[in-house]
Amino acid sequence: MAMALMTPSALQAEDALPGDGTLRFYRLAIPVTVSAFENDLQGDYGLFDDDYQDKVIPFWQACEDFVNEVFVPLGMCFDVVMDKRLVMTEHINALDKSEELPEIGNCTNYINDAIGEGSYDVGMWVTHRETYAENSGLSVEGGAYINSAKGSGYAKTDKWVVAHELGHMFGAPHTTTGEGSLMDSGGDDFFAYPSIKTIRNKAKGTSSYKNVKVDNNAPKFNAEAMQKTYRIPQGACLSIDVQATDAEGHRLLYTAIGCSSANVDNIVEGGSMPHFASFVPQESNVITYQPTYIADIMYDDYFYLKDGTDVPNMEPGNYALSILVNDVPSTAWSYSELQATPFYSTYAIWESQVQIVGGTAFNAKLAPAKNQYTAGEQVTVSWGVNENYFTADSRLRISLSTDYGKTFSATNKIGIKN
């Protein structure tokens, strides 16, 4: 959750990716309230020195590692301030509210009083939140760039929520509900394109604890191997073979995001447009929008849908699709590694369109049905044919999966008349 504080320094810049080639280092303060120390970290003030070393420090380190994992591709690196004074020994009534909304107006002042204004660059409190509380965190959108609000945020004692709220602090709103990315409720560990663009735009030209200019060429698409329009029949899945290279031979990550607008940038907080869920950036260059099924370990013959996509359920029409490729460091994405070998991730973006042709959906059916089938019995497969997409010369290939849709290695028939 974020609240906007409208000041001139919080206005969104208009520059697009890849940014300004500057790796920014920040000192991140994560103050711990009494409720977080006792309830979440299971700390005992009677054993404070031991629990500080055994419980607080490991939590801070886990936060640092995770925050860097998701922010380094944006050109930001964080060093968590390991200072015992950031563990509160007295209740701060405005923050130790496990059910109600904590008050963030004085959060920055509390940190300044504890360790000094010049000892950190951005702060994020952690405090205990009940599961039924109204939210898991709140912060000032763009607060990292406002001196009086640079510590005005809180999160429940969870590294993912800390990173999410920091996304707000560096200017990103929520993406449309349904996304799997860090700035939505999906729970995956990455920023989607709209968030990346917003955060990098706002960071451009700003100072940090340490700015390091890095020369790095962006990856390039093989335009001859890419398409501007990907045409599929209604109800179908979508697979795109992305062809890109990097001049320095860096490791590449691939992702994509699409929506019903003419511009993916319109996927922001409050939007309700149908859209394709963002991919977790992957090393495979094949972007595939298809359901994946996972076998349930507790019940035989039962599976559930994981990382489902709305593409097969999309209405006919044209959808914007942005395909992103970025290079990443081959070493660990830690503060110490990037201090020694600075790296600034660069992006190539392929803007395209997905055209979903309306008509009869494929919808394969089996006879007899699964619950009526006996081993060895012949099975008849039937399917719908979209005559607006397929022609009389179209042929069908039937591939089967034995691992719940992860791979389709068994091909029964090739060239069946549709």
For each of these PLM feature ranges, what is it?
Residues 82, 255-314, 392-418:
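Exoplasmic/lumenal beta-rich domain surfaces
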